[in-house]
Regions:
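A Zn2+-metalloprotease active-site environment signal
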Residues: 1-198
Length: 198
């Protein structure tokens, strides 16, 4: 089921990257109770069975999840985050040596970077992946409004189990619902066009 949905989304990637439909896309479902999905560089996508089963996801909601992960691959977010982390660590190392800071203070600087700066970059990437993923979903003929029901289900499932948004690498579910509502006017017409016969 997940692979069938992904096979409809993959051709839509050409809108964002002309070379992407030719990538060796690979979608796997991992047997796990976790509510998660992730993407590795080059289009290797993993969806945990718990996400699908525990939240009783519809095909449209699965398309939103897979579209989101495809968007991460298209924008090379994991490579970008790795580059930012290396640059930050190098700056912290050089700065601590120049300022003759102790290892403890250098560690505090690193924790501060992770908590306050790296998470903001991650939230920006997540918001971009949500927006692009909804467009891919709509262009493939899946209802992008399922993004709202998906995140409402996630909010219900994760109630109270998250750090404050400013310390999280992902936007809070309620924030995501608001962002998705803002994107829907531009993607629902794409969905309606994809659903038209002819």
């Amino acid at each position: 089921r997940v692979q069938t949905i992904a096979s409809r989304l993959e051709p839509q990637t050409r809108v964002f990257r002309a070379d992407a439909p030719a990538w060796k896309w690979e979608v796997n479902v991992i047997s796990s109770k976790d509510l998660n999905a992730f993407c590795m560089p080059g289009g290797k996508i993993m969806v945990y069975s718990g996400l699908i089963e525990q939240l009783a996801l519809s095909d449209d909601e699965i398309a939103v999840v897979v579209g989101h992960e495809i968007a991460h691959a298209l924008r090379e977010h994991s490579r970008e985050q790795a580059s930012q982390a290396i640059a930050a660590q190098t700056a912290i190392d050089v700065g601590s040596k120049l300022l003759q800071l102790s290892d403890t203070l250098a560690s505090v600087a690193n924790v501060g970077y992770q908590a306050l700066i790296a998470t903001r970059f991650s939230r920006t990437d997540e918001s971009e992946a949500d927006r692009i993923g909804l467009e891919l979903t709509a262009r493939a003929g899946y209802d992008p409004r399922a993004g709202i029901t998906l995140w409402q289900k996630m909010l219900s499932a994760n109630q109270g189990a998250r750090p404050p948004e400013f310390l999280s690498s992902h936007p809070a579910e309620a924030s995501r619902v608001q962002q998705i509502q803002g994107v829907l006017p531009s993607v629902v017409p794409l969905y309606e066009a994809a659903r038209r016969p002819g």
